[in-house]
């Protein structure tokens, strides 16, 4: 599939050119990201399995809120992406003072956004769930409101952690965020087990350990950022710098708009599924958990893509930009082929881990089969390649493509197949594959055209 990107560009570096990244440096960057993503998805699966012991109303309420939670998380991630791109570009241009300044601005913006969004979600939890999902069963609604109000308290700390982790990725040291993520997830999963099985707390037992783990993670990452021997010197006194903030937000806002609308679209299609009852909601939640395993390598490599391409763009080296984009995409195809192949091979055993009824289990198996089979082919070009364009400041194009593809293909066909034709969750997942096909076409053509080369200005 990576041959689609070739166009008129060379597929390797000139012999005399000094590469910006060695094979070892790429692995040092990518492997910890892979482990971090694995931890995140594994803990998410553990949360779902544990709360499933509290009944299908509880798992449905938590899964519906997790869609809103993902919407919030992508806002923080988009802001972190904007900061990571700017820092990487300054490092590529060997402009250390501005790299330090942009690092401080990222942390400041992350903290402010976390406080504002957390307060809004806490106060408006019930109206938000009603807005997104309309009329749902009362016990599902009550579980969702309780979960969202508690988890909203963690948003400021999650935003700070994401910002700090992005800074370490931008300098090629993803090991730090991996270590802190490991501790955060251990706290979370142990806390869940104690609260759910020991204290019989229900959805509270999933939410409170998440809050505690994120507080610890934020404290640790900030301590690392302000160490005297840190590669980046983050200013101890943070004041808003209009010019630098504008540069970060110039990448972060389009990415946030794109990703938040993408997640909002996912929430809308889940709201279509929710009209078919608890069986479809629960099967969709379990399928999302398992499919998260399949895309772990792709997500890790897409994060590495931001650092690598951002550094190449800052150095003004388009040849290396193309070379490393293709290299990382090849890695994504190989690793995602292995991960999704393993899921398909052991699918029934994996779904059997969850406490599901027979009907729910069979539907979950069907949904995972659709996703895993198609992700091997379409996912890397749909979601890894766009990060190369973002790192080159071509954020408006990726935003427009993602929004239009979501609106026209995923939402449109979800309504047609799920609601009008009565396919339920299966119709939504078929529409997802149609959306991926559109994204692949647009992003490949854009990369081949070379239009992204004109977007970065030092």
Where are these regions (language model features)?
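Transmembrane helical elements of multi-pass membrane transporters/channels
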Residues: 28-47, 150, 184, 213-217, ...
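Residue-level hotspots within the lipid-embedded alpha helices of multi-pass solute transporters
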Residues: 37-38, 74, 114, 118, ...
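Small-residue-rich hydrophobic transmembrane alpha-helices
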Residues: 59-119, 158-177, 270, 281-347, ...
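Short runs within selected transmembrane alpha-helices of multi-pass transporters and secretion channels
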Residues: 80, 150-169, 177-188, 206-221, ...
């Amino acid at each position: 599939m990576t041959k689609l990107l070739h166009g008129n560009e060379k597929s390797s570096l000139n012999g005399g050119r000094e590469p910006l990244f060695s094979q070892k440096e790429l692995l040092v960057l990518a492997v910890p990201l892979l482990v971090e993503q694995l931890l995140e998805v594994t803990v998410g699966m553990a949360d779902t399995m544990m709360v499933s012991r509290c009944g299908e109303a509880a798992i449905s309420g938590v899964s519906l809120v997790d869609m809103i939670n993902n919407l919030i998380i992508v806002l923080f991630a988009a802001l972190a992406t904007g900061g990571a791109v700017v820092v990487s570009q300054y490092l590529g241009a060997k402009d250390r003072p501005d790299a330090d300044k942009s690092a401080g601005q990222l942390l400041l913006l992350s903290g402010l956004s976390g406080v504002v969004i957390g307060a809004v979600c806490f106060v408006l939890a019930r109206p938000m769930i009603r807005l997104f999902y309309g009329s749902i069963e009362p016990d599902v609604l009550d579980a969702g409101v309780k979960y969202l109000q508690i988890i909203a308290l963690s948003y400021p700390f999650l935003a700070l952690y994401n910002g700090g982790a992005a800074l370490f990725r931008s300098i090629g040291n993803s090991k730090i965020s991996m270590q802190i993520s490991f501790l955060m997830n251990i706290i979370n999963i142990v806390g869940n087990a104690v609260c759910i099985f020991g204290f019989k707390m229900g959805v509270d037992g999933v939410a409170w350990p998440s809050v505690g783990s994120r507080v610890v993670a934020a404290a640790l990452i900030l301590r690392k950022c302000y160490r005297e021997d840190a590669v980046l010197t983050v200013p101890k006194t943070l004041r808003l710098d209009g010019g630098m903030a504008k540069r970060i937000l110039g990448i972060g806002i389009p990415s946030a708009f794109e990703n938040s609308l993408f997640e909002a679209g996912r929430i809308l299609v889940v709201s279509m599924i929710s009209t078919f009852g608890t069986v479809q909601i629960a099967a969709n939640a379990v399928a999302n958990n398992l499919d998260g395993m399949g895309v772990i390598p792709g997500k890790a490599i897409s994060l590495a893509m931001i650092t690598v391409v951002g550094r190449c763009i800052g150095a003004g080296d388009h040849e290396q930009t193309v070379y490393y984009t293709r290299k990382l995409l090849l890695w994504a195809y190989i690793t995602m082929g292995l991960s999704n192949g393993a899921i398909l091979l052991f699918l029934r055993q994996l779904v059997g881990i969850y406490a599901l009824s027979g009907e729910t289990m069979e539907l979950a198996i069907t949904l995972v089969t659709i996703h895993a089979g198609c992700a091997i082919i379409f996912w890397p070009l749909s979601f890894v390649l766009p990060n190369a364009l973002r790192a080159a400041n071509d954020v408006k194009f990726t935003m427009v493509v993602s929004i239009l593809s979501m609106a026209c293909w995923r939402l449109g066909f979800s309504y047609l197949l799920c609601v009008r034709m009565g396919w339920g969750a299966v119709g939504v997942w078929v529409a997802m594959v149609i959306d991926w096909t559109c994204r692949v076409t647009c992003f490949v053509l854009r990369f081949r055209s070379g239009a992204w080369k004109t977007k970065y200005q030092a």
